[in-house]
Amino acid sequence: MTSTVNLGSDTASKRTVIKSRCNSCCRILVSCVAVICAILALIFLVATIGLSVKLAFTVQEVHNCKQKLSGASTTTAAIYTTPSTMIEALQTNQLKLTTNERRSTPPDCLVEKKLCEGEVRYLKTKGCLGAREGEDLNCIDLVVECVGKPCGHNEDYKECICTNNGTATKCCYN
């Protein structure tokens, strides 16, 4: 005798096919989500590294600018008060001089002032330099352009000093 088992072939096979397709779709969907998350994580990582490098570069730039600004606004200089006063500036930007005085015999008056390692100077052969020209060390706050060439003939001065007020460079004797 033969016996047959009714497996509900139509209904059961349709259910198996649908279940198989759903599982396949779910696996594909999970794989796609994993790939998309990995790509987003990679983009975020690259962006973070790029911003870190840019920030480090900007911080270095700000540091360099601060160094340049501090160098431009304050210049350390050695000032010697002797029969003639010599001021040797380390930079030729805007000079704000700090005093470091060594006194020997105090002079009656200042007759010479040098800036920028002697390239630009006044030299008055008759009389004294006025306060604006260097007799008073508090008055020395000049924007100096070191030119090292005479500005012209004047019997009281061999050379003059040049100042820059931001718009023009002016050489003056008095």
UniProtKB/Swiss-Prot annotation:
InterPro entries in alphabetical order: Metap_SH
Q: What is an example of a Pfam family matching this protein?
A: Sh_2
The protein's topology relative to the membrane is:
Single-pass membrane protein
> What is one cellular component GO term in this UniProt entry?
membrane
List the transmembrane segments.
Answer: 33-53
Name of the protein described by the UniProt record: Small hydrophobic protein
Q: Which UniProt keywords apply?
A: Glycoprotein, Membrane, Transmembrane, Transmembrane helix
Q: Where in the cell is it found?
A: Membrane
- Give the species: Turkey rhinotracheitis virus (TRTV)
- Asked if the keyword Acetylation belongs to this entry, the reply reads no
User: Which gene produces this protein?
Assistant: SH
Residues annotated as glycosylated: N165
| Principal subcellular localization | membrane
